[in-house]
């Protein structure tokens, strides 16, 4: 085995990265610069087609069995792929001493990691993005309290390199010995970094950030837009250059980026997720590593800020128009209400009586008593001019766990909610689990924040819609939008019932006050 390590330009050969079950020896070379690192994207291609996305679960793969054999081979060697992309700066020679050492000290450990995560993927509900992050964590063991396998392997490598330096073949010329000694010393210096836990912790952190960013990008783009973004990635370019166009069409491979991870992590901490997302998009589009420096990141950050500013200006414009339209609507006479049959009205009343009254200072979980098909709180009555509302069970449902919500939906009668994934439910829960808004709605000052958009009749019951402008803070993001509250009159008490409660996003970042999900708000 001979290591190419001249002037800190690292030439790496990846033997598992581009492979198929029939032809596993294909390889692709790539170059990294000083301080740079190869990071895997959570995408897998077969030829020009994306077959695995960050959000792909194993159950999704089984529906398309065409490439399952090749995919299973790659997935069952996923830790070797990660190792080759991240560490393996070697060119193997048959029978090489360092190759044998790798087989003895490291290969078995990586095989075990691959097998464990493959079982986890097949038998669980992990997405490929989550799986890839686990592979990085287990391969580099940065949080392990025990001696890391990578560090132990590094110690063995250093001893072997020292032996190779001391026992160079006598038949070699002095010039050849000097060249070999220089290469081996460079390799030894690199292997010493195997003990640098903080360095590999940064690699794992960068991988997690890229995986999560790619997931956000995927969820926000249509399939054709995503294909355009990934039309010509780094791996595909190198396969073409190395083996030709014909090789690409039959190859299973992951995409990757070469990047200065310290620069990328600093940009994420300083500028936030929106700038990171734009940087990753540019990398997916083929932006070269040497083009991404602090100056370029600054330009991207300024462009994102300008886009936000324009968006906020447009939102303000729309909000003002909405307010004008609502004022006009309030000044007009209410149209004649449609009449409905008595039986229909009773059915609507019965359906929407499944409500729960929530008063100030009370917890939703406190004991309740059944009253005519409705659950009524037994707490204190409203005082001091505070308004009183009952809460429909469809609103209260959002306070439950995603698993419980899914269980109820799958058993329910509403067709549009059946079969929703836990991932979709978690995303929607952010915008629906905002019960803290009701505290403001009940207060005497509610009219300062909520605007009544008028009454209308549906199913024999009088309904009212109110809106308020606010900012929802969740997951480190501030989202500008409109709080929507829909109510109808309960019979026979006449108490308003909140049957619709939602935060509708109109922009990221923004003006105004902040509403925190699931509890207290600061308006």
Curated annotation (Swiss-Prot):
Compositional bias (Basic residues) spans?
330-339
Domain of life where this protein originates: Eukaryota
Q: Where is the composition biased (Acidic residues)?
A: 354-368
Stretches for region Disordered: 326-386
Q: Which residues cross the membrane?
A: none
Q: Where is the signal peptide?
A: none
Q: Where is the composition biased (Basic and acidic residues)?
A: 344-353
Q: Would you identify the family this protein belongs to, as annotated?
A: Belongs to the UPF0329 family.
What protein does this entry describe? UPF0329 protein ECU02_0050
Please name the source species. Answer: Encephalitozoon cuniculi (strain GB-M1)
């Amino acid at each position: 085995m001979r290591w190419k390590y001249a002037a800190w330009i690292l030439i790496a050969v990846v033997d598992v990265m581009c492979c198929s079950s029939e032809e596993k020896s294909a390889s692709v070379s790539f170059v990294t610069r000083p301080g740079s690192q190869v990071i895997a994207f959570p995408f897998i291609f077969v030829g020009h087609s994306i077959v695995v996305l960050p959000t792909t679960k194993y159950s999704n793969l089984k529906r398309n069995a065409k490439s399952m054999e090749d995919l299973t081979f790659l997935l069952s060697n996923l830790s070797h792929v990660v190792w080759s992309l991240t560490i393996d700066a070697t060119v193997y020679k048959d029978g090489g001493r360092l190759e044998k050492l790798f087989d003895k000290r490291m290969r078995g450990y990586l095989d075990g990691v691959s097998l464990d995560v493959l079982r986890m993927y097949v038998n669980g509900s992990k997405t490929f993005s989550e799986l890839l992050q686990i592979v990085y964590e287990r391969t580099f063991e940065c949080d392990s309290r025990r001696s890391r396998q990578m560090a132990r392997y590094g110690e063995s490598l250093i001893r072997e390199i020292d032996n190779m330096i001391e026992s160079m073949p006598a038949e070699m010329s002095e010039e050849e010995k000097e060249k070999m000694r220089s290469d081996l010393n460079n390799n030894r210096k690199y292997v010493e970094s195997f003990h640098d836990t903080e360095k590999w912790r940064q690699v794992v952190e960068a991988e997690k950030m890229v995986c999560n960013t790619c997931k956000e990008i995927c969820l926000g783009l249509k399939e054709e837009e995503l294909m355009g973004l990934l039309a010509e990635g780094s791996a595909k370019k190198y396969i073409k250059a190395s083996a030709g166009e014909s090789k690409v069409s039959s190859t299973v491979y992951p995409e990757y980026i070469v990047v200065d991870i310290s620069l990328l992590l600093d940009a994420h901490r300083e500028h936030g997720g929106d700038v990171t997302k734009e940087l990753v998009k540019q990398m997916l589009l083929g932006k070269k590593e040497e083009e991404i420096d602090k100056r370029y990141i600054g330009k991207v950050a300024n462009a994102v800020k300008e886009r936000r500013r324009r968006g906020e200006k447009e939102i303000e414009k729309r909000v003002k128009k909405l307010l004008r339209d609502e004022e006009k609507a309030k000044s007009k006479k209410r149209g004649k209400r449609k009449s409905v049959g008595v039986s229909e009205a009773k059915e609507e009343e019965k359906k929407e009586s499944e409500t729960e009254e929530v008063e100030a200072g009370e917890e939703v979980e406190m004991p309740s008593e059944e009253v005519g098909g409705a659950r009524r709180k037994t707490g204190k009555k409203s005082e001091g001019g505070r308004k009183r509302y009952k809460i429909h069970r469809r609103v209260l449902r959002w306070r439950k766990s995603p698993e419980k919500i899914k269980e109820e939906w799958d058993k329910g009668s509403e067709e549009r909610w059946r079969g929703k994934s836990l991932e979709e439910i978690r995303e929607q829960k952010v915008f629906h689990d905002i019960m803290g808004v009701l505290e403001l709605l009940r207060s005497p000052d509610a009219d300062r924040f909520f605007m009544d958009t008028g009454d209308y009749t549906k199913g024999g019951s009088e309904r009212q819609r109110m809106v308020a402008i606010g900012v929802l803070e969740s997951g480190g993001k501030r989202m500008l939008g409109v709080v929507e509250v829909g109510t109808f009159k309960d019979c026979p008490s006449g108490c308003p019932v909140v049957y619709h409660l939602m935060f509708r996003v109109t922009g990221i970042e923004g003006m105004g006050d902040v509403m925190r999900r699931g509890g207290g708000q600061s308006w």
